[in-house]
């Protein structure tokens, strides 16, 4: 993944990317040796995990291929789905955020404003304190019970560990340790384990293709796609979604900035 590089259009280069080679490529550098395993990604003074649209720093990244296009896949409500997997809780096949918004606002039809607000409510409910009477929602009621049990186990054993790989995070390495922080760290750990497995499958599939996976950021995957290989993005989507278990949103564009 790191060796793929991101192609830079020098005409739109704003000076933030310091290291560009003679082929107009700049490279990422992932560090997975963090507390939760969630990789940082900085190289040459550029934090690729924090490239934003507001300052135009994404505008310079384009396809290296003539008539190529950038594709991005983003998981929908990823941590909520990871929690549901832990709880063996069956979520609806429709939008999770829409489903939760209907319960937050007690309405059958959700407005765009309510939908956007529900995402923030869910974020607070998952990582912080309970709002909007979320304890009355079955999914969050079970989530909070799991969180309490996780906290009790962590205090007893001085650690948390992945139920899938048994990777451990010691409490002594966590500053200001709390029930919510422990839960958040577990989700980051499970997110990373899941994504590394998916990336391995994707790289294996793309081994004989010209197209390249060029950037991974938490729940997002960016690809530089050759014009003759657009159809292969369907298989990439299938690998990521795991038969619909983890739906993704697909965006494409000529620049990293203009994805839609």
Predicted features along the sequence, with ranges:
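Conserved catalytic palm subdomain of right-hand nucleotidyl-transferase polymerases, strongest
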Residues: 64-79, 120-138
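C-terminal polymerase-core module
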Residues: 129-134, 143-186, 224, 228-260
């Amino acid at each position: 993944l790191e060796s793929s590089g991101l192609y830079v259009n020098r005409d739109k280069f704003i000076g933030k990317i310091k290291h560009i080679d003679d082929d107009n490529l700049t490279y990422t550098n992932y560090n997975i040796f963090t507390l939760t395993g969630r990789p940082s990604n900085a190289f040459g003074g550029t934090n690729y995990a924090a490239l934003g649209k507001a300052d135009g720093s994404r505008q310079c990244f384009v396809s290296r291929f003539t008539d190529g296009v950038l594709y991005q896949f983003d998981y929908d409500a990823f941590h909520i789905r990871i929690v549901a997997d832990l709880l063996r809780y069956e979520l609806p096949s429709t939008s999770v955020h829409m489903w939760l918004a209907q319960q937050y606002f007690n309405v059958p039809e959700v407005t765009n404003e309510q939908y956007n607000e529900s995402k923030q409510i869910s974020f607070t409910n998952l990582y912080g304190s309970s709002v909007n009477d979320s304890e009355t929602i079955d999914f969050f009621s079970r989530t909070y019970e799991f969180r309490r049990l996780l906290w009790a186990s962590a205090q007893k054993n001085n650690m948390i560990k992945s139920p899938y790989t048994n990777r451990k995070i010691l409490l002594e390495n966590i500053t200001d340790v709390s029930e919510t922080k422990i839960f958040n760290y577990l989700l980051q750990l499970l997110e990373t384990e899941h994504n590394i497995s998916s990336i391995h499958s994707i790289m294996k599939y793309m081994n004989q293709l010209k197209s390249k996976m060029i950037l991974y950021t938490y729940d997002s995957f960016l690809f530089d796609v050759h014009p003759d290989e657009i159809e292969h993005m369907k298989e990439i989507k299938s690998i990521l979604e795991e038969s619909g278990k983890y739906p993704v949103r697909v965006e494409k564009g000529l620049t990293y900035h203009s994805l839609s």
